Structure formats: structure tokens, C-alpha cells
Amino acid sequence: MSKFEVYLDEGGKYRFRLRARNGQIIAVSQGYKSEEGCIKGIQSVKENAPNARIIVLE
């Protein structure tokens, strides 16, 4: 199962990464000042991604 991981980066900001079932990192977030803000970012991705359009840039 894919999973979101929350971690503290070297600059002291909270970030999340999305890992695929095979362990590959497929997305990394911006830095957040708080763990709570980071978790809200994850919730936003989970709520909005099902409706996201796919755009191929050429």
C-alpha cells in the first residue's frame, strides 16, 4: 500500500513524501513550519488529487 511519510528536514521544516508500494518516492512536499500544517497538506492532496487533471507538457 502506498503511504505518506512526515519528516523533519535539515532546515527544521516538516515535509511529507508519498511512497509507492514498491518503496519508490513519487512526490515530495514543500516545507511546513508545523507538523499540523504538514498533515493538513497531506489531507489537501488526498482530497484534491482524485479530481486533478492530467496535462502533458510538450
UniProtKB/Swiss-Prot annotation:
InterPro entries documented for this protein: DUF1508 (IPR010879), UPF0339_domain (IPR051141), YegP-like_sf (IPR036913)
Protein family: Belongs to the UPF0339 family.
Protein name (database record): UPF0339 protein MA_3316
